[in-house]
């Protein structure tokens, strides 16, 4: 008889190799055929809603690792919520207006100047839709479950109409105004920018100290002094109209040779050192407030520079006397306005100096620095020129420096509802907690929001102008424009004349002849995405406002979190979200930012093509995503190893349940052995721990808990000793069915627990599980932890056994290395434990030699009675010897009962009995 044919070896068609790059697309096709998103929504209908609102990625180019991290994190949460008593719809969105799309078309050779704005915008829309399609397929490949057929797209007419309504509501409340103010201006984009469109990079700039002679000392100064200012933007000097000093600071008149200079007293030493003054002495001090209304002369133009008081003046750098150009700085503008100065801005849209800067007209602002500095030297006003590298604002799209420039723009007055914004921030739950401080400080300190852009591709600002120049924004005009946009899209604004965009028969006192013109600026794209709470959450039947959660990268505190909060509080008085969760950026394995120049860019597509989407998802679950995270081939190799461990665990469980029918073979908990019940206690601990981790969005804790359970609790212990029973005993042996009962519970629970993270693998495992009826594991709920009677005592006892078992394993390892035994089944062990451990061992009814995977087990005396040469460990001394007897051909246990049964001479007594009872006809 071939005894190997009498072994119940694992049997399953579940493949050992994942082959995910091929298998996942097939699984996704299956999901599409069964309409998995709709099925889950149907299955969870009527449950409380949990709405995670998708911050729209920008529709341009392939998805990158930041997109993958973001979408997968969202998918974890939505999938988990739909398995824990919620209906969790997930509507993906795209942000589709803005400069990058205009640039992409120009780069493709579109001749923009040869077509109308409306024609150009049509091309922009076509391009945006192509990009949406491209990204949609890539997000689906990640295994993200969403309403992919019904996303929200910011260029769609229904969305634009709601955005117009948001603008109209804000205007009605008096929050929208037009004003000339210095704004961030990008000469390369030829448009105003919002704070969220700015990034800081190092820039080399001239650093100059300039003397402004006093013209009128107002009886405080003698008239022969000179104010010293410091600036890193010499090109703004043609726009200088004043000097700001701090009212509370003390200023010193410093005599240096024949000159007298005015600087802040506390900066005397620093300035003296920088300007290399020798024998400088302070001849007089005055308070800043006394210098108000004294007048200096512009160094190279025949005009005055008024001395004014400003709280923005500091002594962190410079001289305490601040060059003030109301057309080129926010503080300058505020102070200048207070003192009635004009807003002089001699720089055009392209960043070129105009005729209002005589002598420098036609020069690009950055190129004007040198001739202006030379002019200062020529007139004897330049005291020092050096160069510094400092952090300077750049256009986040073109990566070129920007300037402050006063222009006529549309603003949303944050000041008008700042208090409500701060209250809304305080009422929101922030994860990580520092998010609250970050947004609170931004809201507290931010100026009014410049919402107009001088571009073509965006939502028009729905304002008309009367013949006398009055802007027209009324309920009637707003509603009419919203209706037009809903019907025709926003391109209608560029296709029709102003009068054809107004309600029929519309009149206005400022237009006696019935003539009107329309605004040509468009809205900031942050106003687009920031209106999604109205256009999506409020408008769609399957969603609700406020959303339960917004989840984006930490750059969105100044972006989408901020703009959404501003528009929602302005319109509804409340935040659009109950909670906000943020994640860090994806860096390479060495912690460097990914860039083309370094050549360290990791793309999601490559990972999915080589390893699979579930490996990428498992990586997302493994990282501390609330900080910046790292990815590299080595890191992915480690993650793939963990995946293999989890997959092999599933395969082992399935293989050993091939002949198990849950309805017939399940053993009641009360009839299980202690070790089996202990395994169920460990499973319940896992369920509790994993669900708590999902609840707190701690996916790394889920990853580690599942990995440890598969490796330590199952592979290294339970499954290891269970093989002897599963393979060797007869199919219906009570111990075998007991173990299968536990394995079945473990398999079902484990499959569900990994579903949010590894949906492809979980749904691949699911149909192989005996007795399941659901079409997909996604249509089930998370397992519930069952409280077993006496669980705590059981856990205490068997945890103690596990620590003692570790001592035994160490001793067996030593014996193997010393060639006392080959493998552990060759061993006979005698234990000399501590009193506590001895009592514990004596209370165990299970076969201890099976639990230790040895052929013979003896309990000797106490630890102190152990032979002197026996290795001693924390809980026991262990004597390892070669077991006596021969090796059984069937179970490989060394036994003295081999051959006792004449019909089965090579088998031990146990195997002979099993064979006779189960396999001999």
From Swiss-Prot:
Binds 1 zinc ion per subunit. Belongs to the class-I aminoacyl-tRNA synthetase family. IleS type 1 subfamily. A motif ('HIGH' region) lies at residues 57-67. Catalyzes the attachment of isoleucine to tRNA(Ile). As IleRS can inadvertently accommodate and process structurally similar amino acids such as valine, to avoid such errors it has two additional distinct tRNA(Ile)-dependent editing activities. One activity is designated as 'pretransfer' editing and involves the hydrolysis of activated Val-AMP. The other activity is designated 'posttransfer' editing and involves deacylation of mischarged Val-tRNA(Ile). NCBIfam families: ileS (TIGR00392). It comes from Bacillus cereus (strain ATCC 10987 / NRS 248). Keywords: Aminoacyl-tRNA synthetase, ATP-binding, Cytoplasm, Ligase, Metal-binding, Nucleotide-binding, Protein biosynthesis, Zinc. GO terms for molecular function: aminoacyl-tRNA deacylase activity; ATP binding; isoleucine-tRNA ligase activity; tRNA binding; zinc ion binding. This is Isoleucine--tRNA ligase 1. One of its GO terms (biological process) is isoleucyl-tRNA aminoacylation. Transmembrane segments: none annotated.
């Amino acid at each position: 008889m071939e005894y190997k044919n009498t072994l119940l070896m694992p049997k399953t068609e579940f493949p050992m190799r994942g082959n995910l790059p091929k298998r996942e697309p097939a699984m996704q096709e299956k999901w599409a055929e069964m309409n998995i998103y709709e099925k889950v929504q149907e299955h969870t209908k009527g449950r409380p809603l949990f709405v995670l609102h998708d911050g729209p990625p920008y529709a341009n180019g392939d998805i990158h690792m930041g997109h993958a991290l973001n979408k997968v994190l969202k998918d974890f949460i939505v999938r988990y919520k739909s398995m824990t008593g919620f209906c969790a719809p997930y509507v993906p969105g795209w942000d589709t207006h803005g400069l990058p799309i205009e640039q992409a078309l120009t780069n493709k050779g579109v001749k923009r100047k040869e077509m109308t704005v409306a024609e150009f915008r049509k091309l922009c829309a076509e391009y945006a839709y192509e990009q949406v399609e491209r990204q949609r397929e890539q997000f689906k490949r990640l295994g993200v479950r969403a309403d992919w057929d019904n996303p929200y797209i910011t260029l769609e007419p229904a969305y634009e109409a709601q955005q117009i309504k948001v603008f109209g509501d804000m205007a009605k409340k008096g929050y929208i105004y037009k004003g000339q103010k210095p704004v961030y201006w990008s000469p390369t984009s030829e448009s105003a920018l919002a704070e969220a469109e700015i990034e800081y990079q190092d820039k080399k700039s001239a650093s100059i100290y300039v003397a402004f002679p006093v013209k009128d000392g107002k009886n405080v100064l003698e008239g022969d002094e000179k104010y010293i200012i410091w600036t890193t933007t010499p090109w703004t000097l043609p726009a200088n109209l004043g000097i700001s000093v701090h009212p509370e600071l003390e200023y010193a008149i410093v005599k240096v040779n024949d000159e007298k200079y005015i600087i802040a007293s506390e900066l005397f030493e620093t300035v003296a050192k920088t300007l290399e003054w020798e024998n400088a002495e302070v001849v007089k001090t005055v308070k800043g407030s006394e210098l108000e209304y004294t007048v200096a002369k512009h160094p190279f133009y025949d005009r005055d520079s008024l001395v004014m008081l400003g709280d923005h003046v500091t002594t962190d750098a410079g001289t305490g006397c601040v060059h003030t150009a109301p057309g080129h700085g926010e503080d300058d503008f505020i102070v200048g306005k207070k003192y009635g100065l004009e807003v002089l801005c001699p720089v055009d849209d392209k960043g070129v100096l105009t005729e209002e800067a005589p002598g420098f007209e036609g020069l690009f602002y950055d190129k004007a620095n040198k001739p202006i500095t030379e002019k200062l030297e020529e007139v004897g006003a330049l005291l020092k020129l050096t160069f510094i590298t400092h952090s300077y604002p750049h256009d986040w799209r073109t990566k070129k420096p920007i300037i402050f420039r006063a222009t006529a723009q549309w603003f949303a007055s944050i000041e008008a509802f700042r208090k409500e914004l701060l209250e809304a921030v305080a009422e929101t739950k922030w994860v990580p907690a520092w998010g609250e401080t970050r947004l609170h400080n931004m809201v507290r300190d931010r100026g009014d929001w410049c919402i107009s852009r001088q571009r073509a591709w965006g939502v028009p600002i729905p304002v008309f102008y009367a013949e006398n120049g009055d802007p027209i924004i009324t309920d009637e005009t707003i509603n009419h424009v919203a209706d037009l946009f809903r019907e025709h899209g926003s391109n209608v604004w560029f296709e029709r004349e102003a009068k054809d965009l107004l309600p029929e028969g519309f009149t206005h006192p400022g237009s006696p002849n019935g003539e009107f013109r329309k605004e040509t600026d468009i809205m900031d794209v942050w106003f687009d995405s920031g209106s999604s709470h109205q256009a999506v959450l409020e408008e769609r039947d399957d969603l609700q406002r406020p959303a339960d959660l917004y989840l984006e990268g930490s750059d969105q505190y100044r972006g989408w979190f901020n703009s959404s909060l501003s528009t929602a509080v302005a319109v509804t008085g409340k935040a659009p979200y109950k909670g906000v969760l943020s994640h860090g950026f994806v860096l390479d394995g060495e912690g460097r930012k990914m860039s083309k120049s370094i050549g360290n860019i990791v793309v999601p597509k490559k990972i999915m093509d080589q390893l699979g989407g579930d490996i990428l998802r498992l990586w997302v679950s493994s990282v501390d995503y609330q900080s910046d995270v790292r990815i590299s081939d080595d890191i992915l190799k480690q993650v793939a190893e963990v995946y293999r461990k989890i997959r092999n665990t599933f395969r082992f469980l399935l293989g050993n349940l091939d002949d198990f029918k849950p309805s017939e073979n399940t053993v009641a908990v009360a009839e299980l052995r202690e070790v089996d019940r202990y395994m169920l206690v460990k499973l319940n601990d896992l369920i509790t721990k994993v669900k708590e981790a999902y609840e707190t969005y701690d996916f790394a804790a889920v990853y580690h808990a599942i990995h440890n359970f598969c490796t330590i609790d199952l592979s290294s212990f339970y499954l290891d000793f269970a093989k002897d029973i599963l393979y060797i005993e007869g199919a219906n042996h009570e111990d075998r069915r007991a173990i299968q009962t536990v394995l079945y519970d473990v398999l079902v629970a484990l499959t569900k627990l990994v579903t949010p993270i590894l949906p492809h693998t979980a749904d691949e495992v699911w149909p192989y599980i005996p007795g399941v009826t659901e079409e997909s594991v996604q249509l089930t709920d998370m397992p519930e932890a069952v409280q077993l009677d006496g669980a705590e005592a059981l856990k205490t006892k068997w945890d103690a056994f596990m620590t003692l078992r570790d001592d035994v394993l160490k001793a067996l390892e030593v014996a193997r290395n010393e060639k006392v035994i080959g493998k552990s089944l060759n061993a006979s062990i005698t234990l000399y434990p501590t009193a506590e451990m001895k009592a514990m061992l004596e209370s165990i009814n299970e076969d201890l030699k099976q639990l230790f995977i040895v052929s013979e087990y003896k309990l000797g005396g106490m630890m102190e009675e152990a032979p002197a040469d026996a290795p001693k460990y924390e809980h026991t001394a262990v004597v390892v010897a070669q077991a006596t007897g021969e090796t059984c051909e069937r179970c490989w246990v060394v036994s003295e009962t081999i051959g006792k049964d004449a019909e089965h001479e090579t088998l031990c007594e146990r195997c002979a009995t099993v064979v006779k009872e189960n396999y001999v006809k």
